[in-house]
């Protein structure tokens, strides 16, 4: 039992005979109920309460891997987040009203089948998780009951989402209907080839200017998720074969490297490479004979990342301004000057790398190579803008008509 729980129990001891702890609990529950009942928005005859907003926030933030408390701690962001999230609940309410007006709430057998498929897919994933946790709990403590553990995990998981298993299907159904409204609003939004080409040309000009002043700017673009259309010299896509040292050698070499013990590091990596020399020779010999690098990756590679797509065939972007933790990796890449070329063996604390240039990237990315991706990105952006414009119009109209009032300050 941790110290906080012990302290809480000790505080209750003097009150046990008078029922103090239970009274405190009841009082707190009443206070919470009053707080959660605060009305933050009124739309016609529908109230949106603080409790509803908090539940929605916790659901969406959990999917993003963060918490409401974390967001509230960021004072510069909290007010914006509060207003936008409250507005979203209002928009959902208005959109559901629109759905009924348009008949989108009338579901066919096929519609219900799609809803069930999405619901069952999610539940099946949760059930697999619950089975794993329950099994582990029983293996760790045989006195525990598997069915009870399984039920507890399922209940806890759905509680964290703010649903029961039954009410979650209603949520899936609601989102299905709201998606119909969204699709109706954005159905006429398009992007022309001329718009895409104009954006491409503009971005190329801007990026060329940025790279001329600061070539390392390419890495900033990648970090913020901006599409790179112009690459500095030395950039390429690469993939590699890693021949790993045994765990003991790898651990010792990593320690020696971290402690800057150069003589010990040299000894360990030299011995480690010697143990792998037969494999190195075989790979290099077969490459010289014209064998495909990808085939050798499948046979020899100890780096699991490169067993997955797109890394297996396309590799990863790298260049002189990239950040790379593997000692000597950037230097080895810098010596590759043409597509298909393979580096000399690079020895590190992990093992031995043989790196292949998959594609040279320096210069302007051809328009045809990015047209489809840019079109999809621009179309998505225009749809989002159209949705925001229309839904803001709904809210403005409702406020003007006196049927919508929003009170974020009551939170």
Language-model-derived ranges and their functions:
Residues 51, 55-59, 80-88, 92-97, ...:
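Solvent-exposed, polar/charged alpha-helical surfaces in well-ordered, non-transmembrane soluble domains
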Residues 70-71, 101-111, 211-212, 292-299, ...:
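Surface-exposed patches in mature extracellular/periplasmic domains of secreted proteins
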Residues 27-170:
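N-terminal targeting/tethering segments
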Residues 121-133, 207-210, 303-312:
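Secretory-pathway/luminal and periplasmic proteins that interact with or process carbohydrate-rich
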Residues 38-49, 56, 98, 237-244, ...:
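Soluble periplasmic/extracytoplasmic beta-strand elements of cell-envelope proteins
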């Amino acid at each position: 039992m941790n110290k906080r729980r012990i302290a809480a129990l000790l505080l209750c001891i003097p009150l046990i005979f008078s029922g103090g702890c239970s009274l405190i609990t009841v009082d707190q529950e009443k206070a919470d109920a009053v707080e959660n009942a605060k009305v933050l928005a009124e739309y016609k005859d529908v109230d949106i309460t603080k409790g509803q907003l908090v539940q929605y926030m916790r659901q969406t933030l959990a999917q993003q891997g963060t918490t409401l408390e974390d967001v509230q701690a960021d004072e510069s962001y909290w007010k914006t987040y509060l207003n936008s999230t409250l507005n979203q609940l209002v928009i959902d309410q208005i959109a559901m009203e629109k759905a009924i007006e348009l008949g989108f709430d009338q579901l066919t057998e096929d519609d219900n089948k799609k809803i069930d498929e999405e619901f069952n897919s999610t539940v099946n994933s949760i059930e697999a998780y619950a089975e794993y946790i329950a099994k582990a709990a029983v293996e760790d403590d045989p006195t525990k009951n598997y069915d009870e553990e399984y039920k507890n995990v399922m209940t806890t998981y759905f509680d964290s989402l703010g649903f029961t298993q039954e009410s979650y299907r209603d949520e899936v159904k609601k989102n299905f209907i709201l998606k119909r409204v969204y699709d109706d609003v954005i159905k006429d939004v398009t992007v022309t080839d001329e718009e895409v080409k104009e954006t491409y040309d503009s971005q190329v000009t801007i990026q060329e200017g940025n790279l001329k002043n600061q070539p390392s700017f390419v890495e900033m673009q990648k970090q913020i998720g901006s599409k790179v259309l112009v690459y500095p010299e030395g950039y390429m896509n690469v993939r590699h074969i890693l021949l790993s040292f045994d765990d003991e050698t790898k651990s010792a070499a990593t320690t020696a490297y971290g402690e800057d013990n150069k003589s010990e590091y040299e000894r360990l990596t030299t011995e480690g490479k010697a143990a792998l020399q037969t494999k190195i020779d075989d790979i290099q010999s077969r490459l010289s004979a014209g064998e495909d690098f990808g085939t050798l990756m499948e046979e020899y590679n100890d780096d699991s990342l490169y067993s997955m797509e797109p890394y297996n065939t396309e590799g990863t972007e790298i260049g002189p301004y990239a950040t790379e933790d593997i000692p000597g990796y950037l230097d080895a890449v810098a010596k590759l000057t043409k597509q298909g070329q393979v580096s000399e063996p690079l020895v590190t604390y992990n093992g031995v790398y043989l790196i292949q240039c998959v594609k040279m990237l320096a210069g302007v990315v051809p328009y045809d190579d990015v047209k489809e991706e840019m079109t999809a990105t621009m179309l998505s952006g225009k749809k989002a803008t159209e949705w925001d414009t229309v839904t803001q119009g709904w809210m403005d109209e409702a406020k003007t008509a006196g049927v919508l009032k929003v009170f974020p300050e009551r939170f």
